[in-house]
C-alpha cells in the first residue's frame, strides 16, 4: 500500500488500541515511475528492493474512526505538534504527518533494534541470535549471569544519551512524563557515520559502536516551565514519581525520578520498586525512606549509587535538580576509552548494514518471537492507559488480567509494539517495542489492565466515564426494573437471584483470572503488573481525593487531642445531639448495646424508634439504609479507628472512673447520622442553593449526599442485573437457614451487600481497561440475559453512575471552595464523615462505570461480529430502500434515547406506589417511610438546575433532557403528594401504627 504516492507500507510490527505501526520505506523516483498514485492503495513488488539506511520508516496509522471524541483527537494533535517542533539526534524523528479522510499517518524514524527492554529482558536470546548485538555484547559482556544488568559502557552510554535528550526537552520547557525502558528506542549504529568523529559531529553523544538511544512516545508530553506544577496523573506506575502516585502536584523533576528507575534497571535488570498496584508501590517507596536496596549479585561503583540515590529521592524538593544532573561527573564522563579499534569498527559496520538490508526487526531474530509470529501473524495485544479516557483513567486497584485462549499467549509479545500502550507481559516475553503513543485507556493486555474511563462529549453511542468512561453507546428501548415486592415468595425469589448474581460476579472474575496464560500469583508476573500499566487521572479526581485526605488528616489530629469521658447513662443522647447541633464538633460517646438489640432510654417509657440498621428493608429494590450505613462506617473506621468502644461492656461504675482518649464515632451515632441524611428530606430539600458558610455547609452536603445516594442505589440495582446469573439449580430452599431470608424480617439486601462488598472490590479492578481481544470470548457472549437487555441495562447503569458522579463532584467543589476560603481549618465530625463518604462513593462510581464501559464495548463487538456474519449470508436486494431505512433508524434512535431524568422519574413513582401499597396493607411502615423519602429525593434531583462546573457536564449533557415548565409543575405536584403521604405516615408511626 502506498501513502501519498511516496510511502510504501509493508508488514505490521505493532498494534495498539487506536493505532497500528508498520514498517515501510520511502519511494524514490525510480520506484514511482512518474505515476500519480496519490492516496490510492497500490501493491508494490519489492521482493528485490535493496533497503538503504535512508529510506526505511515506521508508519503509525491511526484510523479516524477510533478517535471518537474530541479529547482523543487533541491528544494525537498535541503529540504531532510536539514532534514537529523538536529535532534532536536522541529523539525519534517525525518525518511527516499525512492525513486522509479515514486515517492519520505518522511517518516516523525507524529503529530496527527495538527498545531498551530487549537488551535487558531478552539479552540471552539476543546474544545468541542477533549478528550485530552478538558482537557488541561480546565486546561489552554483562557483569553477571545471575541478573539482567548491563555492562558499564552500556549504562553510561545510555545515561549520557538520555541526559542529552532531556536537556534539550528542558530547553523547550517540555516534560515527557513517561520515561521508561519501553519508550527508549534503539537505532542501528553506523547509519550516517563511519567513525567516532563523524558520530559526534552529527550531535550524538556516548559510544559510537553501541546502538543509539532515542526517546519515543510523546503522547503524555506537555509544555511545563520549571516554575509550573502539573496535576494530571499519567505514565507507567513502576517508573512514576511518588508525588504523582500520591495524587500531588508535580513539576518537571518527575522525569528525573523516572531516569533514576531506568538507571537502576540498567544496572540490575529490574526496577528498584515493585508492587501489585500503585498504592502498594507508593507505600513501599515511602517506607524505604530514601534507602535504595542494591543487590549483592552485582557490585556497581559508588558514584552510580550516589546518582541513583539522588534521582530516587522521595521529596521532589530534595531531589537532584536538572542542572546538577546534567553536570554530574558520570553524565559528562569521557567514554572514548570504550571506543573500539578500527578493524572492529569495520566488522561492526558491515554487520550493521547487513541487519539493515535484511529488513528484519529485532524480534524476528529471536526464535521465540518467530514462533509467535507464525501463530499470530505478528499481532500484539494492546495495553492502553489509562487513557486516557478522556479526562479520566482509573488509577486504583490495578490487577492483572488474562486471555483464555491458548493462542492468546502469543498476542502479548509477538512483535515489537510501537504503541506505548503495549509493553512486555513477563520477564521472559518482553519484546514489545513502543513507538505509538496512543495511550487509549480502556483496553488492556493479558497480564495487565488499565483503567481509564472517558467522560467525553461523544454521541450516545459510547459513553465516557478517566478519573471516567470511554464513549458509550447507541440507544435502545428503555427497560424499567420491576420491583418484586408484592409477596414474600416473590421477595425470596428476588433475594435468591441477587445473592446468586453476587456470587457469580466473583466467580466470573475468578474464571477469567484462572485462564491467564501465566499464573498471576507468580511473583515475577505480579512484579510486572505496574510495569505494563499506564495511568492518567485528571484534575477532578485528584481534587476529590486530595481534599478528602486533607480533611481526614485534620480529623485524626482532632481525635488524638480530645479526651472523652463517659456520660452518665442516656443512650438517646446522640440522637438529640445530632438533631440539635448541626455543626457537631465533639460529643460524648455513650454505651450502646449490640446493633441487633433495641435500645431504650433508662428507666423512662420513652423508647426511640429503631434505627435504619435495625429496621431491615424488605423492599428488595431499595438498598439505601444498610449500604449507606456500611459505607459511612468504613469511612469512619478509616478516619478515627475502630468504632467499637473498648469498654462498652463494662459496668457503669467502671465507666465513670474512666477518662481516656476515645474514638469520636460509635455505632449508634453512626446510625443516627445515616437516618438523618435520607429521612430528613423535608428539612434538607433546597439546602444546596443557600449561601455557604460554616453553619450551612453540613446541611448542603447532606442534601447533595442524599441525592447522590438515591441515584447511586438505583445504579447499583441496574448494575447487579448485568452480572451473569448461573442457573439456580440449588434453590433457596436448599440453602442453609442462615444463608437465606426466611421471613419478612430477613434482610436479603444486607446479605447481598456483604457479598458484593467482597466481589466488587476484587472483580471490578481486574476488569478495568481490558482490551476487547481479551474479553471477546469470555463472559458477555455467554450472559444469561439477551444481549439487547444486557446492553440496555449497562447503558442505563452507566448513565446513573455518571449522574451520581456529577452530584458528588458538585458536593466536593462546594466543600473545596468553603474549605480553602475559610480562615479556620476546623471541621466537624459529621462534615468529615460526609466528605469521606463522598470520596468513597466517587471512586466507587468510577470503578463501576469503567466496568460497564468495557462491558458495553464488548457487547458492541459481539454485535458487530454477529452482524458481519449475518451480512455474509444475506443478498443485497434492498438497495432501493437504504435511504428510507437509514432515516427510520435515525428516528428510532431519537425515540430510544435514554435520559437520566426519565429513569429517575419512573423509578421515583414506582417506589412511591410500592410504598403506598404496603402502607395500605399496614406492612413495613418504617420501610415505607424510607421509600417515600427516597422517592422525594429522586424527584427533587429532577428540579435541580443542570450542573455546569464539573468534569462530567459534557457527558451528562448528552443524556440529560431539558424539562419544560409543564414537566416541572407535574413533578412538583408529585412531590407535594408524596410529602403529604410521608407526613401522614410519620404521624401513624409515632402513634404506634408500626
Swiss-Prot record:
Entry keyword Nucleotide-binding: yes
Top-level class of the enzyme under EC nomenclature: transferase
EC number in record: 2.7.11.1
Positions of the catalytic residues: 178
Compositionally skewed regions (Low complexity) per UniProt: 412-445, 468-478, 598-610
Cystine residue pairs: none
Entry binding sites for ATP: 13-21, 60
Sequence ranges assigned to domain Protein kinase in this UniProt record: 7-331
Pfam family, one: Pkinase
Extent of the signal sequence: none
Annotated keywords: ATP-binding, Autophagy, Cytoplasm, Kinase, Membrane, Nucleotide-binding, Protein transport, Serine/threonine-protein kinase, Transferase, Transport
GO cellular component, one term: Atg1/ULK1 kinase complex
InterPro entries membership: Atg1-like, ATG1-like_MIT2, Atg1-like_tMIT, Kinase-like_dom_sf, Prot_kinase_dom, Ser/Thr_kinase_AS
Entry's localization field: Cytoplasm; Preautophagosomal structure membrane
Membrane-protein topology: Peripheral membrane protein
Reaction(s) catalysed by this chain's protein: L-seryl-[protein] + ATP = O-phospho-L-seryl-[protein] + ADP + H(+); L-threonyl-[protein] + ATP = O-phospho-L-threonyl-[protein] + ADP + H(+)
Family statement drawn from the similarity comment of this UniProt entry: Belongs to the protein kinase superfamily. Ser/Thr protein kinase family. APG1/unc-51/ULK1 subfamily.
Protein name stated in the entry: Serine/threonine-protein kinase atg1
Organism: Vanderwaltozyma polyspora (strain ATCC 22028 / DSM 70294 / BCRC 21397 / CBS 2163 / NBRC 10782 / NRRL Y-8283 / UCD 57-17) (Kluyveromyces polysporus)
Gene name tied to this protein: ATG1
Amino acid at each position: 500500500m502506498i501513502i501519498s504516492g511516496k510511502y510504501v507500507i509493508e508488514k505490521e510490527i505493532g498494534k495498539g488500541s487506536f493505532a497500528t505501526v508498520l514498517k515501510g520505506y520511502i519511494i524514490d523516483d525510480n520506484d514511482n515511475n512518474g505515476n500519480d498514485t496519490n492516496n490510492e492503495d497500490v501493491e508494490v513488488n519489492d521482493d528485490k528492493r535493496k533497503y538503504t539506511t535512508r529510506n526505511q520508516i515506521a508508519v503509525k496509522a491511526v484510523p479516524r474512526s477510533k478517535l471518537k471524541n474530541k479529547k482523543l483527537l487533541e491528544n494525537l494533535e498535541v503529540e504531532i505538534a510536539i514532534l514537529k517542533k523538536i529535532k534532536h539526534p536522541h529523539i525519534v524523528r517525525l518525518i511527516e504527518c499525512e492525513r486522509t479522510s479515514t486515517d492519520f499517518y505518522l511517518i516516523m524514524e525507524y529503529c530496527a533494534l527495538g527498545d531498551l527492554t530487549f537488551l535487558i529482558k531478552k539479552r540471552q536470546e539476543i546474544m545468541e541470535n542477533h549478528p550485530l548485538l552478538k558482537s557488541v555484547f561480546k565486546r561489552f559482556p554483562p557483569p553477571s549471569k545471575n541478573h539482567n544488568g548491563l555492562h558499564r559502557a552500556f549504562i553510561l552510554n545510555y545515561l549520557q544519551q538520555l541526559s542529552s535528550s532531556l536537556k534539550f526537552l528542558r530547553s523547550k520547557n517540555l516534560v515527557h512524563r513517561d520515561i521508561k525502558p519501553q519508550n527508549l528506542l534503539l537505532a542501528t549504529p553506523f547509519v550516517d557515520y563511519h567513525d567516532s568523529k563523524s558520530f559526534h559531529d552529527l550531535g550524538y553523544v556516548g559510544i559510537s559502536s553501541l546502538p543509539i538511544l532515542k526517546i519515543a512516545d510523546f503522547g503524555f508530553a506537555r509544555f511545563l516551565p520549571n516554575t509550573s506544577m502539573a496535576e494530571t496523573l499519567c505514565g507507567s506506575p513502576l517508573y512514576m514519581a511518588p508525588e504523582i502516585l500520591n495524587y500531588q502536584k508535580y513539576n518537571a523533576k518527575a522525569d528525573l525520578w523516572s531516569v533514576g528507575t531506568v538507571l537502576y534497571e540498567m544496572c540490575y535488570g529490574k526496577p528498584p520498586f515493585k508492587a501489585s498496584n500503585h498504592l502498594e508501590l507508593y507505600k513501599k517507596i515511602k517506607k524505604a525512606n530514601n534507602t535504595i536496596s542494591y543487590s549483592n549479585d552485582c557490585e556497581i561503583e559508588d558514584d552510580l549509587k550516589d546518582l541513583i540515590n539522588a534521582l530516587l529521592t522521595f521529596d521532589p524538593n530534595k531531589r537532584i535538580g536538572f542542572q546538577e544532573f546534567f553536570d554530574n561527573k558520570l553524565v559528562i564522563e569521557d567514554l572514548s576509552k570504550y571506543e573500539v579499534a578500527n578493524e572492529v569498527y569495520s566488522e561492526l559496520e558491515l554487520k550493521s548494514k547487513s541487519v539493515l538490508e535484511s529488513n528484519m526487526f529485532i524480534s524476528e531474530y529471536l526464535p521465540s518471537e518467530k514462533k509467535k509470529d507464525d501463530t499470530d501473524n505478528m499481532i500484539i495485544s494492546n495495553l492502553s492507559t489509562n487513557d486516557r479516557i478522556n479526562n479520566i483513567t482509573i488509577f486504583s486497584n490495578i490487577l492483572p488480567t488474562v486471555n483464555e485462549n491458548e493462542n492468546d499467549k502469543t498476542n502479548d509479545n509477538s512483535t515489537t509494539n510501537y504503541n506505548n500502550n503495549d509493553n512486555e507481559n513477563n520477564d521472559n516475553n518482553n519484546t514489545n517495542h513502543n513507538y505509538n503513543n496512543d495511550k487509549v485507556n480502556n483496553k488492556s493486555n493479558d497480564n495487565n489492565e488499565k483503567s481509564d474511563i472517558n467522560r467525553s462529549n461523544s454521541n450516545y453511542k459510547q459513553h465516557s466515564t478517566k478519573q471516567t468512561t470511554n464513549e458509550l453507546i447507541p440507544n435502545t428501548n428503555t427497560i424499567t426494573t420491576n420491583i418484586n415486592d408484592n409477596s414474600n415468595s416473590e421477595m425470596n425469589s428476588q433475594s435468591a437471584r441477587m445473592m446468586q448474581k453476587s456470587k457469580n460476579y466473583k466467580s466470573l472474575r475468578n474464571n477469567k483470572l484462572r485462564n491467564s496464560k501465566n499464573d498471576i500469583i507468580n511473583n515475577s508476573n505480579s512484579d510486572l503488573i505496574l510495569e505494563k500499566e499506564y495511568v492518567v487521572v485528571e484534575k477532578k479526581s485528584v481534587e476529590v481525593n486530595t481534599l478528602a485526605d486533607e480533611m481526614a488528616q485534620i480529623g485524626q489530629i482532632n481525635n488524638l487531642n480530645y479526651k472523652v469521658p463517659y456520660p452518665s447513662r442516656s443512650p438517646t443522647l446522640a440522637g438529640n445531639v445530632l438533631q440539635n447541633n448541626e455543626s457537631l464538633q465533639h460529643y460524648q460517646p455513650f454505651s450502646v448495646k449490640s446493633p441487633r438489640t433495641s435500645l431504650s432510654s433508662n428507666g423512662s417509657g420513652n423508647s426511640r424508634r429503631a434505627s435504619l440498621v435495625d429496621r431491615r428493608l424488605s423492599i428488595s429494590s431499595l438498598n439505601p439504609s444498610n449500604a449507606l450505613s456500611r459505607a459511612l462506617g468504613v469511612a469512619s473506621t478509616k478516619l478515627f479507628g475502630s468504632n467499637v468502644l473498648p469498654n462498652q461492656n463494662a459496668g457503669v461504675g467502671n465507666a465513670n472512673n474512666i477518662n481516656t482518649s476515645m474514638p469520636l464515632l460509635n455505632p449508634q451515632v453512626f446510625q443516627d447520622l445515616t437516618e438523618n441524611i435520607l429521612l430528613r428530606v423535608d428539612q434538607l430539600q433546597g439546602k444546596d442553593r443557600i449561601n455557604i458558610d460554616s453553619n450551612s455547609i453540613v446541611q448542603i452536603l447532606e442534601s447533595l449526599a442524599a441525592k447522590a445516594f438515591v441515584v447511586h442505589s438505583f445504579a447499583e440495582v441496574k448494575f447487579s442485573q448485568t452480572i451473569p446469573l448461573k442457573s439456580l439449580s440449588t434453590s433457596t430452599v436448599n440453602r442453609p437457614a442462615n444463608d437465606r431470608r426466611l421471613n419478612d424480617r430477613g434482610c436479603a439486601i444486607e446479605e447481598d451487600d456483604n457479598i458484593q462488598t467482597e466481589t466488587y472490590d476484587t472483580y471490578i479492578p481486574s476488569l478495568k481497561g481490558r482490551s476487547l481481544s481479551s474479553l471477546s470470548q469470555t463472559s458477555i457472549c455467554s450472559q444469561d440475559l439477551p444481549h439487547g437487555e444486557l446492553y440496555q441495562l449497562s447503558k442505563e447503569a452507566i448513565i446513573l453512575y455518571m449522574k451520581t458522579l456529577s452530584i458528588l463532584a458538585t458536593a466536593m467543589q462546594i466543600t473545596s471552595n468553603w474549605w480553602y476560603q475559610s480562615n479556620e481549618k476546623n471541621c466537624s465530625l459529621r462534615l468529615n464523615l460526609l466528605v469521606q463518604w463522598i470520596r468513597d462513593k466517587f471512586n466507587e462510581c468510577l470503578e463501576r462505570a469503567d466496568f460497564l464501559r468495557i462491558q458495553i464495548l464488548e457487547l458492541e463487538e459481539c454485535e458487530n461480529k454477529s452482524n458481519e456474519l449475518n451480512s455474509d449470508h444475506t443478498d443485497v436486494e434492498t438497495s432501493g430502500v437504504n435511504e428510507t431505512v437509514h432515516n427510520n433508524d435515525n428516528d428510532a434512535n431519537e425515540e430510544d434515547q435514554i435520559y437520566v431524568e426519565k429513569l429517575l422519574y419512573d423509578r421515583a413513582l414506582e417506589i412511591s406506589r410500592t410504598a403506598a401499597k404496603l402502607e395500605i396493607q399496614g406492612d413495613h411502615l418504617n420501610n415505607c417511610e424510607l421509600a417515600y423519602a427516597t422517592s422525594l429525593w429522586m424527584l427533587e434531583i429532577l428540579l435541580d438546575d443542570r450542573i455546569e462546573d464539573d468534569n462530567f457536564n459534557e457527558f451528562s449533557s448528552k443524556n440529560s433532557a431539558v424539562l419544560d415548565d409543564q414537566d416541572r409543575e407535574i413533578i412538583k405536584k408529585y412531590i407535594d403528594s408524596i410529602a403529604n403521604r410521608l407526613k401522614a405516615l410519620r404521624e401513624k408511626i409515632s402513634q404506634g401504627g408500626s
